[in-house]
């Protein structure tokens, strides 16, 4: 980036943020003393050395172990060498002697080895081995390894959370030009975690981080410019930031389909997290294994898929995946044959890359009409892997697979028409197939749709649509793996570690993370923020989630204004948010709350008839609302009757009705009958 342009952008940021009162309102509520951001290098090292001597950082255990394995193996993994005091001494010498700064070949090699392990496997045992190598590399002055260790302190990896130590190490690394450290300091400043809450400073950190190459900073800035958070809303600037990240993600996805991450919503089942459908329960997993060994082919294929990509809380394990696929393939499963072909086509530790073997299994699956097998053969011919390049054959197989609804084949057809590979360029057909594939969540199809909308290729240009699509692609980055580690941390009771991971994802624009962070803050279990900060920050995050379409968050904002949590009581604003949730999202809770406000005239004009209508709508919208609505209506009718008794002249009414002369001496039986009929009507509504 041009230095002058960077300086101008920073000045604009400072000017805009100084006009924003969010930081001022928030800082007035801060009472605790924040850690200064200007700490000398020697003090940093002295502090870290003290920590190690006290034993606060020398027992590093793996608290992120997969719960499925943890229930069977209760032992804890330990990283050897993390307690080595030489790490701090060498780092201290490294920073104090600029002339002698150098990353040794051995340290660089150790870091590369650790990084390779993380890229090739997602198992916790392998992660532990990787961090052991990072520790040794950091001992030798490797800056990237130091970044890894600072991250471990920040996020509480392996039970070693120490935010103060992380901040001081980040500050030292930032002075050496580390863009990851710049991003981390920006994140901490934006929340006021261990540092002063300062949005202007956070934006400056993010700007320098993005200029240095931080994809996270790029994504954060994209989200801020898209939503107008402490900057002037600017779709084109957001597009520029998001596109850079999306290009990076698309390049990774073209080499691998990536690993989908389960984004568990803490707001849905807070009382029973172990039953969450996004995470496979240990007992159910054991039952599936039993069925698979008994010969259940469908279960064998399912377990193979789960282990292949590491879903539902299971570790990625290529050996187990291949084991189950081979058993199912032997029983004649076309899907299993296709997945075996896929494993050999891509290559991994259990199934080394082998085009001939891939062709064999893809052909076996395709002969049974399997869409995955047909798509696999198309890929072999398209790329010329083990066979000559033949776009005609590739097109034929892609079309057959696409007709069966396989999204990857639909994407490949779209790409052929988009790029003109073996066919005439046809942007309308390209858009058609990209759109079809995107409906199933195919990430590269979403990326190319974003490209078309961003450039106006084959469609009318739309910045907003392009940004939303790019944002979806960006959220498939490797950083999304923190959803799983944050969830396990929360489940294990490590609330601070969970919160800080969700908070970073929330800062990057993930709506689920914004809701989860607000939920944790609202529970008042977090210790990394002062109690006076919890509700204001939770309100801020609920608001961001609501803007992204979360109905529950919208109702929460109404609740905060109704009760005065983190803000002043404001019934009118509460009613506004309840109305939005009721009208736009059809929220039964919002309808009920709004009905109550109309019933009592809180923030809006009292309207009994509208209150009745909203209560009825709430009952019709959600079965769970039937009982609360029944009692609310009973109370409303009772109060209405008492009101009539107190404020109306019933003598005149009875005289006007002339019940004795009109109905006869048994008029009281008629009234009783009417009351019984009304009760039957109410009971019918209750059970409807």
Swiss-Prot record:
Chief subcellular location: membrane
Superkingdom of source: Eukaryota
Cytoplasmic side of membrane: 684-688
Signal peptide (residue range): 1-18
Pfam families for this protein: Sel1 (PF08238)
Glycosylation site residues: 34, 162
Positions of Sel1-like repeats: 107-142, 143-178, 179-214, 215-250, 297-333, 334-370, 371-406, 407-442, 443-478, 551-586, 588-623
Ranges in the topological domain labelled Extracellular: 19-662
SMART domains: SEL1
Membrane topology field: Single-pass type I membrane protein
Record InterPro entries: Sel1-like, Sel1_AlgK, TPR-like_helical_dom_sf
Keywords: Cell projection, Glycoprotein, Membrane, Nucleus, Repeat, Signal, Transmembrane, Transmembrane helix
Transmembrane segments: 663-683
Cellular localization per UniProt: Membrane; Cell projection, Cilium; Nucleus speckle
GO cellular component: cilium; membrane; nuclear speck
PANTHER family, sorted: PROTEIN SEL-1 HOMOLOG 2 (PTHR11102:SF53), SEL-1-LIKE PROTEIN (PTHR11102)
Family: Belongs to the sel-1 family.
Protein name, as recorded: Protein sel-1 homolog 2
Lineage: Eukaryota, Metazoa, Chordata, Craniata, Vertebrata
Protein's gene: Sel1l2
């Amino acid at each position: 980036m041009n230095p002058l342009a960077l300086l101008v952008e920073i000045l604009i940021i400072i000017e805009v943020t100084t006009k924003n009162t969010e930081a001022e309102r928030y800082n007035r509520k801060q009472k605790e003393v924040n850690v200064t951001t200007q700490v000398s290098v020697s003090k940093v090292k002295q502090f870290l050395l003290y920590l190690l001597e006290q034993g606060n950082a020398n027992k590093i255990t793996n608290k992120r172990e997969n719960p499925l394995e943890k229930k069977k193996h209760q032992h804890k993994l330990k990283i050897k060498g993390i307690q080595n005091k030489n790490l701090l001494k060498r780092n201290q010498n490294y920073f104090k002697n600029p002339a002698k700064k150098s990353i040794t070949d051995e340290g660089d090699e150790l870091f590369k080895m650790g990084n390779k392990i993380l890229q090739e496997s997602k198992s916790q045992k392998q992660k532990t081995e990787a961090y052991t190598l990072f520790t040794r590399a950091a001992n030798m002055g490797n800056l990237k390894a130091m970044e890894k260790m600072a991250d471990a302190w920040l996020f509480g990896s392996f039970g070693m959370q120490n935010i103060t130590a992380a901040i001081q190490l980040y500050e030292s690394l930032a002075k050496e030009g580390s863009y990851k450290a710049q991003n981390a300091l920006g994140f901490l400043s934006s929340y006021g975690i261990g540092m002063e809450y300062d949005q202007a400073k956070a934006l400056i950190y993010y700007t320098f981080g993005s200029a240095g190459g931080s994809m996270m900073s790029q994504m954060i800035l994209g989200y801020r410019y898209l939503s107008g958070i402490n900057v002037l809303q600017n779709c084109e600037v957001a597009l520029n930031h998001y596109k850079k990240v999306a290009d990076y993600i698309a390049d990774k996805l073209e080499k691998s389909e990536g690993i989908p991450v389960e984004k568990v919503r803490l707001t849905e089942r807070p009382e029973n997290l172990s039953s969450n459908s996004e995470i496979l329960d240990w007992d159910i997993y054991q039952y599936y294994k039993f069925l698979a060994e008994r010969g259940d082919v469908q279960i064998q294929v399912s377990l193979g898929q789960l282990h292949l990509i590491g879903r539902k809380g299971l570790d990625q394990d290529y050996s187990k995946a291949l084991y189950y696929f081979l058993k199912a393939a032997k029983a004649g499963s076309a899907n299993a044959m296709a997945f075996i072909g896929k494993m050999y086509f891509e290559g991994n530790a259990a199934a080394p890359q082998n085009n001939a073997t891939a062709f064999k299994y893809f052909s076996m699956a395709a002969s049974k009409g399997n869409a995955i097998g047909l798509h696999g053969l198309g890929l072999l011919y398209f790329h010329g892997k083990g066979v000559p390049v033949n776009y005609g054959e590739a097109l034929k197989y892609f079309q057959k697979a696409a007709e069966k609804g396989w999204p990857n084949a639909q994407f490949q057809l779209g790409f052929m028409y988009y790029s003109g590979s073996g066919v005439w360029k046809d942007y309308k057909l390209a858009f058609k197939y990209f759109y079809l594939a995107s409906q199933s969540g195919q990430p590269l199809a979403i990326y190319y749709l974003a490209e078309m909308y961003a450039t106006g290729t084959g469609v009318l240009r739309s910045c907003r649509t392009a940004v939303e699509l790019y944002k979806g692609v960006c959220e498939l980055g490797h950083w999304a793996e923190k959803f799983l580690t944050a969830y396990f941390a929360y489940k294990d009771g490590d609330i601070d570690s969970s919160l800080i991971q969700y908070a970073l994802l929330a800062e990057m624009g993930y709506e689920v993370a914004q809701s989860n962070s607000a939920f944790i803050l609202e529970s008042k279990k977090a210790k990394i923020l002062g109690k006076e900060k919890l509700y204001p920050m939770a309100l801020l995050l609920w608001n961001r989630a609501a803007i992204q379409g979360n109905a529950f968050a919208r109702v929460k904002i109404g609740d905060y204004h109704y009760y005065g949590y983190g803000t002043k009581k404001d019934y009118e604003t509460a009613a506004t948010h309840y109305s939005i949730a009721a009208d736009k999202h059809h929220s039964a809770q919002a309808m009920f709350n709004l009905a109550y406000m109309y019933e009592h005239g809180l923030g809006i004009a009292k309207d009994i008839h509208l209150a009745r209508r909203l209560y009825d709508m709430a009952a019709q919208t959600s079965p769970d609302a039937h009982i609360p609505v029944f009692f609310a209506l009973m109370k409303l009718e009772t109060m209405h009757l008492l009101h009539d008794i107190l404020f109306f002249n019933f003598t005149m009414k009875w005289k006007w009705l002339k019940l004795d002369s009109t109905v006869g001496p048994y008029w009281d039986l008629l009234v009783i009958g009417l009351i019984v009929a009304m009760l039957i009507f109410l009971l019918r509504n209750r059970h409807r």
